[in-house]
UniProtKB/Swiss-Prot annotation:
GO terms for biological process: translation. Gene3D superfamilies: 2.30.30.790. This is Large ribosomal subunit protein bL19. The lineage of its organism: Bacteria, Pseudomonadati, Pseudomonadota, Gammaproteobacteria, Enterobacterales. It holds the Pfam family Ribosomal_L19. The gene is rplS.
Amino acid sequence: MSNIIKQIEQEQMKQNVPSFRPGDSVEVKVWVVEGSKKRLQAFEGVVIAIRNRGLHSAFTVRKISNGEGVERVFQTHSPVIDSITVKRRGAVRQAKLYYLRERTGKAARIKERLN
């Protein structure tokens, strides 16, 4: 039974997901339905957490919008996601960057990874 589930999950998974880590700045383009119209909406921010669980993988992106912190959790293999673009690589030493929630301005900056 578990082989059937694994096979179905494997078929559902996207193959073109770029590799990114916590601390990286990414732009996620998401399909949004408003009434009868369908359009792309971009959400750009810093990846603060990644959850690797196969088909159920997710990542959290945080940005500051009008002085207010906004976080959004995306399912990595969701059909709603059109594309994920890595804008900048960040050098951090933790897997979860929840400490950025308390920081603002220059204190919330992340060094750029050079390699």
